[in-house]
Amino acid sequence: MPKAKTHSGASKRFRRTGTGKIVRQKANRRHLLEHKPSTRTRRLDGRTVVAANDTKRVTSLLNG
């Protein structure tokens, strides 16, 4: 049986940490930021851990 391919879209969006958690970027921080409050853009900064419900699905896309 051939090797399973990693989902290329998922590999660009998700990353595995050293401890095995899966992290993602937060949405709504790409463009049209002029009218959004600074507090909101700061809150959307950085990465966050993927919800426990979604981890199984994301892991299968990443071949893990």
From Swiss-Prot:
The keyword Ribosomal protein applies. It comes from the Bacteria. InterPro entries: Ribosomal_bL35, Ribosomal_bL35-like, Ribosomal_bL35_CS, Ribosomal_bL35_sf. Keywords: Ribonucleoprotein, Ribosomal protein. The keyword Membrane does not apply. Residues 1-22 are annotated as: Disordered. One of its GO terms (molecular function) is structural constituent of ribosome. One of its GO terms (biological process) is translation. One of its GO terms (cellular component) is cytosolic large ribosomal subunit. Belongs to the bacterial ribosomal protein bL35 family. HAMAP family: Ribosomal_bL35. This is Large ribosomal subunit protein bL35. It comes from Mycobacterium tuberculosis (strain ATCC 25177 / H37Ra). The gene is rpmI.
